[in-house]
């Protein structure tokens, strides 16, 4: 990966600075106003945007949560450990991708400064056009059909090594 880009991605965010300065847990108010920990796209995306990126929060256990959008995590360097639906443990390594639909609960174990993951925050509407180009019989196509049609409330994920 481009060295300049990696320098930018490994920078300590304001949230991470507070964690390093002694705050010992995630400030849920950054992510949601709801009692249940559902990360809200309205807090993560600028109005009118369908997709955005942000770095994974490091240095702290990110508690069990889900999103009201599709999340795609790309691991740029190092590794992060994800516990999915309280039972499946996945260690995401450099170059790996992990997709979550809106019903998947997961938590993330603490990461170091060199463990750089990028979260793609994607509203389901983003896939309206791209979905037409994806073969519906493929693994990604089936995942998108179940995610976009919301006919089920089952937490699903895709993991690519």
Role assignments for model-derived ranges:
Residues 1-2, 72:
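Gram-positive cell-envelope targeting signals
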Residues 2-20, 24, 41-42, 111-161:
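A hydrophobic/aromatic-rich effector-binding and dimerization subdomain
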Residues 10-13, 30-32, 41, 57, ...:
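Residue-identity detector for threonine
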Residues 23-53:
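N-terminal, Lys/Arg-enriched amphipathic/low-complexity engagement segments
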Residues 34-35, 46-47, 53-56, 82, ...:
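Short amphipathic alpha-helical segments, especially helix-boundary/capping motifs
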Residues 49-142:
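N-terminal regulatory/effector-sensing and dimerization cores
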